[in-house]
């Protein structure tokens, strides 16, 4: 079994901390069933991942991209803004392109309270027999 050290891999990945992150991510991928790019030689997954990086059978940039993708919880999707949004500086100016009006219904405080009471479940009072 050949000993793989950080010095063997540091010329492939500049930062040793990034190297550890990439090797750990690759070791987890191997544990979850990813194909090996080199012979295992009875080595454990972290050693195999370091050997893959040292022998350049995997691309560190691809590994970095996969690592970032695996850590993302939410993917941002750029949605187009509607064309009718007025600019901040032109608050007093009118938009002539589209004359859509939004009707806003005003509610009194009493109507709002009645509506909220209808949404809340009633608490039942336990009946006590004496």
UniProtKB/Swiss-Prot annotation:
Domain of life per record: Bacteria
Keyword annotations: DNA-directed RNA polymerase, Nucleotidyltransferase, Transcription, Transferase
- Compositional bias of kind Basic and acidic residues: 110-124
GO MF assignments: DNA binding; DNA-directed RNA polymerase activity
UniProt-listed GO biological process terms = DNA-templated transcription
Q: Which Gene3D superfamilies match?
A: 3.90.940.10
Any one cellular-component term (Gene Ontology): DNA-directed RNA polymerase complex
State the residue spans of region: Disordered.
80-99, 110-130
Q: Which residues form a coiled coil?
A: none
Q: Which InterPro entries match?
A: DNA-dir_RNA_pol_omega, Pol_omega/Rpo6/RPB6, RPB6/omega-like_sf
Question: One Pfam family name from the record?
Answer: RNA_pol_Rpb6
Q: What is its EC number?
A: 2.7.7.6
Q: Which reaction does it catalyse?
A: RNA(n) + a ribonucleoside 5'-triphosphate = RNA(n+1) + diphosphate
Describe the task this protein carries out: Promotes RNA polymerase assembly. Latches the N- and C-terminal regions of the beta' subunit thereby facilitating its interaction with the beta and alpha subunits.
| Subunit structure, as described in the record | The RNAP catalytic core consists of 2 alpha, 1 beta, 1 beta' and 1 omega subunit. When a sigma factor is associated with the core the holoenzyme is formed, which can initiate transcription.
> What family name appears in the similarity comment?
Belongs to the RNA polymerase subunit omega family.
Q: What is this protein called?
A: DNA-directed RNA polymerase subunit omega
What organism does this protein naturally occur in? Nitrobacter hamburgensis (strain DSM 10229 / NCIMB 13809 / X14)
This protein's gene is called: rpoZ
């Amino acid at each position: 079994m050949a000993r793989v050290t950080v010095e063997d891999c540091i010329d492939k990945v500049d930062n040793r901390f990034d190297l550890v992150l990439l090797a750990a991510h690759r070791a987890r991928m191997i544990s979850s069933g990813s194909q090996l790019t080199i012979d295992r030689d009875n080595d454990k997954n972290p050693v195999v991942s370091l050997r893959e990086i040292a022998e350049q059978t995997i691309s560190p940039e691809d590994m970095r991209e996969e690592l970032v993708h695996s850590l993302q919880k939410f993917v941002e999707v750029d949605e187009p803004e509607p064309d009718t949004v007025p600019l901040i500086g032109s608050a007093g100016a009118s938009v002539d392109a589209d004359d859509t009006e939004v009707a806003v219904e005003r509610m009194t405080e009493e109507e709002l309270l009645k509506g909220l009471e209808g949404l809340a479940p009633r608490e039942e009072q336990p009946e006590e027999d004496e």
